[in-house]
Amino acid sequence: MNTHTKLSSEVLGIDAAKVAERIESSILDCLHHQLKRKGVVLGLSGGIDSSVVAALCVRALGAERVLGLFMPEAESSSDTMHLARLVAESLGIDSMLEDITPILRAAGCYRRRDDAIRKVLPAYQESHKCKIVLPNFLDAPAYPFYSVVVQSSDGVQTRARLTAEAFLGIVAASNFKQRTRKMIEYYHADRLNYAVVGTPNRLEYEQGFFVKNGDGAADLKPIAHLYKTQVYRLAEYLNIPREIRQRQPTTDTYSLDQSQEEFYFALPYDKMDLCLYARNQGFPAIEAGAATGLTAEQAERIYRLIDSKRNATRYLHMNPVLVESVFRAAS
């Protein structure tokens, strides 16, 4: 239990210049001495994380050795391309457009997802929009269930609780999107002798908010140790365009607008960051609640959520299991 530091948003403060310098040095060293690659490839979503990582790579390697990829699909937000181009242009890096819609259609991504939705909403049509959401975790039953929200072409929304089979089917089909993007990233990395850079922040990385062998795959992850609050502070220091810094964090996975809060984290990122920090540093839940405006009971719920996500997503962090060790240390 932490009995010395007063818990407040100030505990997540950083010296942005020093943090940036350390990350840039690490990128350069990793690329040259460990990965032995000429440059880096990364997907640009128009979000804060990929924008910050791109800027750090440019500062470390030079714009000429950074390739940004735009990889929209049929259900991507209209903001995605605009903001992704904005960051690429502001950094002066080469960029390429790879529309992954044909690949997803060929793999049955949309069809498989729609079939899963019809297990709970048989009238669902291809023209409808959808997303999956959690209930308000702070006031929900002990074990919250996901629901699917469907919007018809005339704007009418319907909501239905998902069975385990339907939920897993929707998620499995949607994961084609992240895995397809990563496949494209590695294609360009292979042809250029570049490394693939991942863009998770600590909240996402530690809580398993990524797809195994999808956006979770990368050769280096420069900001995985930084809470999202700290990434925003770094973005300001790096002069990331204001339009990107002011954008609400989104999954940009489903055809209906969806925040990360309603899909996965239960709280806005600044409060979730502080709760995760408090849990990691041994603060009692009542102090986390006081620092984030939650009741003691609500803070306890968030602590349980943090622990359950750690346990449930441990598999995502695991390397392939070998029966016997293959590479042994030299004697």
PLM regions and their residue ranges:
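ATP/NTP-dependent adenylation/nucleotidyl-transfer catalytic domains that generate, transfer
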Residues: 2-42, 52, 56-59, 64-67, ...
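Conserved G/P- and acidic residue-centered "switch" motifs that form tight phosphate/ATP-binding loops
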Residues: 47
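Acidic, Mg2+-coordinating phosphoryl-transfer loop and its flanking beta/alpha structural elements
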Residues: 72
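Conserved donor sugar-nucleotide recognition element shared by glycan-biosynthetic enzymes
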Residues: 80
